[in-house]
Amino acid sequence: MSTGKNNLLYSCIKKAKAIVKKLPPVQYAREYKILSGSSVLMLHRCEEYDTTKLLPNEILKVSPQYLEQFIQKASKTHTFISLDDLSAPLPEKPFMVFTFDDGYKDNLKKALPVFEKYGVPFTVYVTTCFPDYTANLWWFVLDDIISSNSVIKTSDGVVWDCTTKQRKIDVYMALREIILKFPADDFENKFTEYFSGYKINLKEKAKELALSWDEVKQLAESPLCTIGAQTTNHVNLAEMDDDAAYQEILQSKQQLEEKTGKQVSHFAFPFGTANEVTEREYRLAQKAGFKTAVVSFGGNITDLSEKTLFKIPRKMLVDVYHEF
Protein backbone atom coordinates (compact mmCIF):
# COMPACT_ATOMS: atom_id res chain seq x y z
CA MET A 1 0.00 0.00 0.00
CA SER A 2 1.11 3.56 -0.59
CA THR A 3 0.56 7.26 -0.13
CA GLY A 4 -1.45 7.23 -3.33
CA LYS A 5 -3.80 4.62 -1.90
CA ASN A 6 -3.99 6.63 1.32
CA ASN A 7 -5.01 9.73 -0.62
CA LEU A 8 -7.63 7.67 -2.42
CA LEU A 9 -9.08 6.52 0.91
CA TYR A 10 -9.20 10.07 2.25
CA SER A 11 -10.91 11.13 -0.95
CA CYS A 12 -13.48 8.36 -0.51
CA ILE A 13 -14.13 9.43 3.08
CA LYS A 14 -14.67 13.02 2.00
CA LYS A 15 -17.08 11.96 -0.73
CA ALA A 16 -18.94 9.63 1.61
CA LYS A 17 -19.49 12.38 4.16
CA ALA A 18 -20.77 14.65 1.43
CA ILE A 19 -23.23 11.94 0.44
CA VAL A 20 -24.58 11.77 3.96
CA LYS A 21 -25.13 15.50 4.23
CA LYS A 22 -26.76 15.99 0.87
CA LEU A 23 -28.79 12.92 0.05
CA PRO A 24 -30.69 12.62 -2.22
CA PRO A 25 -29.12 15.35 -4.46
CA VAL A 26 -25.58 13.95 -4.18
CA GLN A 27 -26.92 10.45 -4.74
CA TYR A 28 -28.13 11.42 -8.16
CA ALA A 29 -25.04 13.50 -8.88
CA ARG A 30 -22.78 10.56 -8.05
CA GLU A 31 -24.76 8.16 -10.18
CA TYR A 32 -25.03 10.73 -12.94
CA LYS A 33 -21.25 10.94 -13.13
CA ILE A 34 -20.97 7.17 -13.30
CA LEU A 35 -23.74 6.90 -15.86
CA SER A 36 -22.31 9.62 -18.08
CA GLY A 37 -20.46 7.94 -20.91
CA SER A 38 -18.79 4.54 -21.12
CA SER A 39 -16.74 3.27 -18.21
CA VAL A 40 -15.21 0.40 -16.27
CA LEU A 41 -16.42 0.30 -12.67
CA MET A 42 -14.19 -0.64 -9.74
CA LEU A 43 -15.66 -2.53 -6.79
CA HIS A 44 -14.16 -4.64 -4.04
CA ARG A 45 -16.87 -6.20 -1.91
CA CYS A 46 -20.59 -6.95 -2.20
CA GLU A 47 -21.85 -7.01 1.35
CA GLU A 48 -24.09 -5.14 3.76
CA TYR A 49 -22.54 -2.17 5.49
CA ASP A 50 -21.50 -2.89 9.10
CA THR A 51 -22.24 0.17 11.26
CA THR A 52 -19.87 -1.09 13.96
CA LYS A 53 -16.89 -0.92 11.59
CA LEU A 54 -14.94 1.96 10.09
CA LEU A 55 -15.57 3.92 6.94
CA PRO A 56 -12.16 3.42 5.24
CA ASN A 57 -13.00 -0.29 4.88
CA GLU A 58 -16.78 -0.10 4.69
CA ILE A 59 -16.65 2.38 1.79
CA LEU A 60 -15.33 -0.50 -0.32
CA LYS A 61 -18.64 -2.35 0.01
CA VAL A 62 -21.77 -2.14 -2.08
CA SER A 63 -24.80 -4.02 -0.80
CA PRO A 64 -26.46 -6.64 -3.03
CA GLN A 65 -29.60 -4.50 -2.94
CA TYR A 66 -27.80 -1.41 -4.17
CA LEU A 67 -25.95 -3.38 -6.85
CA GLU A 68 -29.27 -4.67 -8.14
CA GLN A 69 -30.86 -1.21 -8.12
CA PHE A 70 -27.86 0.27 -9.89
CA ILE A 71 -27.97 -2.40 -12.61
CA GLN A 72 -31.67 -1.73 -13.13
CA LYS A 73 -31.03 1.99 -13.54
CA ALA A 74 -27.91 1.62 -15.72
CA SER A 75 -29.61 -0.88 -18.03
CA LYS A 76 -31.86 1.90 -19.33
CA THR A 77 -28.93 3.79 -20.82
CA HIS A 78 -26.00 1.38 -21.06
CA THR A 79 -24.96 -1.93 -22.55
CA PHE A 80 -23.18 -4.28 -20.15
CA ILE A 81 -20.13 -5.94 -21.68
CA SER A 82 -17.23 -8.09 -20.48
CA LEU A 83 -13.58 -7.16 -20.69
CA ASP A 84 -13.23 -9.69 -23.49
CA ASP A 85 -15.61 -7.51 -25.52
CA LEU A 86 -13.66 -4.36 -24.81
CA SER A 87 -11.91 -3.67 -28.07
CA ALA A 88 -11.82 -1.10 -30.83
CA PRO A 89 -13.99 0.13 -32.37
CA LEU A 90 -16.03 1.17 -29.34
CA PRO A 91 -19.76 0.42 -29.33
CA GLU A 92 -21.95 3.35 -30.30
CA LYS A 93 -24.19 2.95 -27.24
CA PRO A 94 -22.60 3.78 -23.86
CA PHE A 95 -21.26 0.63 -22.21
CA MET A 96 -20.31 -0.43 -18.72
CA VAL A 97 -17.94 -3.08 -17.35
CA PHE A 98 -18.10 -4.32 -13.74
CA THR A 99 -14.83 -5.32 -12.05
CA PHE A 100 -13.98 -6.46 -8.52
CA ASP A 101 -10.49 -6.30 -6.99
CA ASP A 102 -8.60 -8.66 -4.67
CA GLY A 103 -10.89 -11.72 -4.46
CA TYR A 104 -13.40 -11.71 -1.59
CA LYS A 105 -15.87 -14.49 -0.77
CA ASP A 106 -18.83 -12.16 -1.13
CA ASN A 107 -18.02 -11.73 -4.83
CA LEU A 108 -19.23 -15.32 -5.19
CA LYS A 109 -21.85 -15.48 -2.44
CA LYS A 110 -23.51 -12.08 -2.90
CA ALA A 111 -22.49 -10.50 -6.22
CA LEU A 112 -22.74 -13.51 -8.54
CA PRO A 113 -26.47 -14.13 -7.85
CA VAL A 114 -27.25 -10.50 -8.73
CA PHE A 115 -25.28 -10.64 -11.97
CA GLU A 116 -26.89 -13.97 -12.85
CA LYS A 117 -30.36 -12.54 -12.25
CA TYR A 118 -29.77 -9.83 -14.86
CA GLY A 119 -27.34 -11.65 -17.14
CA VAL A 120 -24.61 -9.08 -16.54
CA PRO A 121 -20.94 -10.04 -17.12
CA PHE A 122 -18.26 -9.08 -14.60
CA THR A 123 -14.60 -9.62 -13.79
CA VAL A 124 -12.93 -10.58 -10.52
CA TYR A 125 -9.22 -9.72 -10.32
CA VAL A 126 -7.72 -12.26 -7.93
CA THR A 127 -4.59 -11.61 -5.93
CA THR A 128 -3.33 -15.16 -5.54
CA CYS A 129 -2.22 -14.78 -1.92
CA PHE A 130 -5.94 -14.44 -1.10
CA PRO A 131 -6.97 -18.00 -2.04
CA ASP A 132 -3.56 -19.22 -0.84
CA TYR A 133 -4.60 -17.78 2.55
CA THR A 134 -1.20 -16.18 2.92
CA ALA A 135 -2.58 -12.65 2.56
CA ASN A 136 -2.12 -10.38 5.56
CA LEU A 137 -5.50 -8.62 5.61
CA TRP A 138 -4.26 -6.36 8.36
CA TRP A 139 -6.59 -3.48 7.52
CA PHE A 140 -9.55 -5.57 8.69
CA VAL A 141 -7.72 -6.71 11.83
CA LEU A 142 -6.83 -3.10 12.61
CA ASP A 143 -10.49 -2.18 12.13
CA ASP A 144 -11.50 -4.92 14.59
CA ILE A 145 -9.07 -3.65 17.23
CA ILE A 146 -10.09 -0.01 16.94
CA SER A 147 -13.82 -0.65 16.60
CA SER A 148 -13.99 -2.78 19.75
CA ASN A 149 -11.96 -0.50 22.03
CA SER A 150 -12.32 3.06 23.31
CA VAL A 151 -8.58 3.25 23.95
CA ILE A 152 -5.78 1.19 22.45
CA LYS A 153 -2.10 1.00 23.31
CA THR A 154 0.67 0.02 20.91
CA SER A 155 4.04 -1.46 21.80
CA ASP A 156 5.80 1.87 21.29
CA GLY A 157 3.94 3.15 24.35
CA VAL A 158 1.50 5.39 22.50
CA VAL A 159 -2.06 5.46 23.83
CA TRP A 160 -4.68 6.12 21.16
CA ASP A 161 -8.01 7.75 21.97
CA CYS A 162 -10.80 5.87 20.18
CA THR A 163 -13.76 7.23 22.12
CA THR A 164 -15.73 8.58 19.14
CA LYS A 165 -16.38 7.32 15.63
CA GLN A 166 -14.40 10.15 14.10
CA ARG A 167 -11.46 9.55 16.43
CA LYS A 168 -11.54 5.87 15.54
CA ILE A 169 -11.27 6.80 11.86
CA ASP A 170 -8.45 9.27 12.58
CA VAL A 171 -6.57 6.65 14.60
CA TYR A 172 -7.09 4.08 11.85
CA MET A 173 -5.58 6.39 9.24
CA ALA A 174 -2.66 7.36 11.50
CA LEU A 175 -1.85 3.75 12.36
CA ARG A 176 -2.22 2.81 8.73
CA GLU A 177 0.65 5.13 7.84
CA ILE A 178 2.83 3.49 10.49
CA ILE A 179 1.91 -0.04 9.42
CA LEU A 180 2.67 0.68 5.78
CA LYS A 181 6.30 1.17 6.78
CA PHE A 182 6.65 -2.27 8.36
CA PRO A 183 9.17 -4.46 6.46
CA ALA A 184 7.45 -6.75 3.98
CA ASP A 185 9.72 -9.71 4.77
CA ASP A 186 8.77 -9.66 8.48
CA PHE A 187 5.38 -8.01 8.33
CA GLU A 188 3.31 -10.51 10.30
CA ASN A 189 5.73 -10.60 13.23
CA LYS A 190 6.07 -6.83 13.27
CA PHE A 191 2.31 -6.29 13.17
CA THR A 192 1.66 -8.85 15.91
CA GLU A 193 4.38 -7.35 18.08
CA TYR A 194 3.09 -3.80 17.59
CA PHE A 195 -0.36 -4.86 18.77
CA SER A 196 0.89 -7.38 21.34
CA GLY A 197 -1.89 -6.51 23.79
CA TYR A 198 -4.56 -7.83 21.44
CA LYS A 199 -5.53 -11.22 20.08
CA ILE A 200 -4.43 -11.27 16.44
CA ASN A 201 -4.54 -13.91 13.74
CA LEU A 202 -3.92 -12.43 10.32
CA LYS A 203 -4.26 -15.72 8.48
CA GLU A 204 -7.65 -16.47 10.04
CA LYS A 205 -8.93 -13.17 8.67
CA ALA A 206 -7.88 -14.28 5.20
CA LYS A 207 -9.78 -17.56 5.61
CA GLU A 208 -12.82 -15.61 6.80
CA LEU A 209 -12.98 -13.10 3.95
CA ALA A 210 -10.96 -14.33 0.97
CA LEU A 211 -12.08 -16.67 -1.78
CA SER A 212 -10.73 -20.21 -1.54
CA TRP A 213 -9.31 -21.83 -4.65
CA ASP A 214 -12.46 -23.95 -4.95
CA GLU A 215 -14.51 -20.75 -4.86
CA VAL A 216 -12.30 -19.13 -7.49
CA LYS A 217 -12.97 -22.17 -9.68
CA GLN A 218 -16.72 -21.82 -9.07
CA LEU A 219 -16.58 -18.23 -10.27
CA ALA A 220 -14.48 -19.22 -13.27
CA GLU A 221 -17.12 -21.78 -14.26
CA SER A 222 -19.79 -19.10 -14.53
CA PRO A 223 -20.24 -17.93 -18.13
CA LEU A 224 -20.72 -14.41 -16.77
CA CYS A 225 -17.52 -14.20 -14.72
CA THR A 226 -14.06 -13.52 -16.09
CA ILE A 227 -11.13 -14.19 -13.76
CA GLY A 228 -8.35 -11.63 -13.96
CA ALA A 229 -5.03 -11.36 -12.12
CA GLN A 230 -3.73 -8.79 -9.63
CA THR A 231 -0.22 -10.02 -8.75
CA THR A 232 0.66 -12.72 -6.23
CA ASN A 233 1.05 -10.51 -3.14
CA HIS A 234 -0.76 -7.20 -3.86
CA VAL A 235 2.48 -5.26 -3.77
CA ASN A 236 3.47 -1.82 -5.00
CA LEU A 237 5.12 -2.81 -8.27
CA ALA A 238 6.75 0.59 -8.71
CA GLU A 239 8.92 -0.10 -5.64
CA MET A 240 10.30 -3.33 -7.11
CA ASP A 241 13.06 -3.94 -9.62
CA ASP A 242 12.17 -5.01 -13.14
CA ASP A 243 12.50 -8.75 -12.65
CA ALA A 244 10.70 -8.89 -9.30
CA ALA A 245 7.83 -6.78 -10.60
CA TYR A 246 7.55 -8.89 -13.73
CA GLN A 247 7.47 -12.12 -11.72
CA GLU A 248 4.70 -10.74 -9.48
CA ILE A 249 2.63 -10.08 -12.59
CA LEU A 250 3.51 -13.21 -14.56
CA GLN A 251 3.26 -15.72 -11.72
CA SER A 252 -0.22 -14.58 -10.77
CA LYS A 253 -1.33 -15.18 -14.35
CA GLN A 254 0.30 -18.60 -14.48
CA GLN A 255 -1.08 -19.72 -11.12
CA LEU A 256 -4.63 -18.64 -11.93
CA GLU A 257 -4.49 -20.39 -15.30
CA GLU A 258 -3.22 -23.57 -13.66
CA LYS A 259 -5.91 -23.51 -10.95
CA THR A 260 -8.87 -22.62 -13.17
CA GLY A 261 -7.87 -24.28 -16.43
CA LYS A 262 -8.79 -21.08 -18.25
CA GLN A 263 -6.78 -18.39 -19.97
CA VAL A 264 -6.29 -15.28 -17.84
CA SER A 265 -6.07 -12.26 -20.12
CA HIS A 266 -6.82 -9.27 -17.89
CA PHE A 267 -4.79 -7.57 -15.16
CA ALA A 268 -5.39 -4.97 -12.45
CA PHE A 269 -2.51 -2.99 -10.97
CA PRO A 270 -2.49 -3.16 -7.16
CA PHE A 271 -3.45 0.21 -5.66
CA GLY A 272 -3.48 1.47 -9.21
CA THR A 273 -2.83 5.18 -8.79
CA ALA A 274 -0.25 7.22 -10.69
CA ASN A 275 2.10 6.73 -7.72
CA GLU A 276 2.19 2.96 -8.22
CA VAL A 277 1.79 2.62 -11.96
CA THR A 278 4.26 4.02 -14.46
CA GLU A 279 5.02 3.33 -18.10
CA ARG A 280 7.27 0.47 -16.97
CA GLU A 281 4.37 -1.32 -15.28
CA TYR A 282 2.23 -0.94 -18.40
CA ARG A 283 5.00 -2.54 -20.46
CA LEU A 284 5.46 -5.39 -17.98
CA ALA A 285 1.76 -6.27 -18.04
CA GLN A 286 1.86 -6.37 -21.82
CA LYS A 287 5.04 -8.45 -21.78
CA ALA A 288 3.37 -10.99 -19.46
CA GLY A 289 0.79 -11.69 -22.13
CA PHE A 290 -2.27 -9.85 -20.87
CA LYS A 291 -4.72 -8.25 -23.28
CA THR A 292 -5.82 -5.45 -20.96
CA ALA A 293 -4.83 -3.81 -17.68
CA VAL A 294 -6.81 -1.42 -15.48
CA VAL A 295 -5.82 1.35 -13.10
CA SER A 296 -7.75 2.83 -10.16
CA PHE A 297 -8.20 6.36 -11.41
CA GLY A 298 -9.57 8.21 -14.39
CA GLY A 299 -12.98 8.57 -15.90
CA ASN A 300 -14.79 7.60 -19.06
CA ILE A 301 -13.34 5.44 -21.81
CA THR A 302 -13.06 7.57 -24.91
CA ASP A 303 -10.32 5.79 -26.82
CA LEU A 304 -8.97 2.29 -27.20
CA SER A 305 -5.64 1.46 -28.76
CA GLU A 306 -2.80 -0.96 -28.13
CA LYS A 307 -1.33 1.54 -25.69
CA THR A 308 -4.47 2.59 -23.81
CA LEU A 309 -5.63 -1.01 -23.35
CA PHE A 310 -2.97 -1.29 -20.62
CA LYS A 311 -4.02 1.81 -18.72
CA ILE A 312 -7.80 1.53 -18.78
CA PRO A 313 -9.34 4.01 -16.31
CA ARG A 314 -11.96 3.01 -13.75
CA LYS A 315 -14.62 4.72 -11.67
CA MET A 316 -15.27 3.58 -8.12
CA LEU A 317 -18.87 2.58 -7.47
CA VAL A 318 -19.99 3.74 -4.01
CA ASP A 319 -23.16 2.51 -2.33
CA VAL A 320 -25.00 5.77 -1.72
CA TYR A 321 -27.47 4.11 0.63
CA HIS A 322 -24.85 3.28 3.26
CA GLU A 323 -25.63 4.98 6.55
CA PHE A 324 -22.28 6.72 6.97
Task: Describe each PLM feature range.
Residues 2-98, 106, 137, 221-222, ...:
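C-terminal active-site subregion of NodB/CE4 polysaccharide deacetylases
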Residues 41, 47, 116-275, 312:
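Metal-dependent polysaccharide deacetylase catalytic core of the NodB/CE4 family, i.e.
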Residues 86, 101-103, 127-129:
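Beta-hairpin (beta-strand-turn-beta-strand) motif
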Residues 98-99, 227:
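Residue-level marker for buried hydrophobic side chains located in beta-strands
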Residues 102-109, 114:
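Short acidic, Gly/Ser-rich segments with clustered Asp/Glu that frequently serve as metal-coordination loops
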Residues 113, 217, 282-283:
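Alpha-helical segments flanking ligand/cofactor-binding loops in enzyme cores
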